Amino acid sequence: MGNVVLILRIMPESPDVDLEDLKARLRAEVKGLQDIREEPIGFGLKSLKIAVVVSDAGGESDATEAKIMALDGVERAEIIELTLT
């Protein structure tokens, strides 16, 4: 089995969510996290764009997305890109 790189966009619940705290929790909870970047959306709201390396075994990408969605302060997490490594 190989690995895939997932690029996910994470939308916080509101502009009041502490993104530095959310980044710290992502680093602690998401195995294979490689990169985190902030992207402005508008009206003071920013999203996070992250890169995660996971196994291409069935269900790994969905499990990663679900784990992120379960974090406090996260409104939505969606895989926007997927590539083989």
Where do the model's predicted regions map?
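Long, contiguous binding/interaction regions
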Residues: 1-85
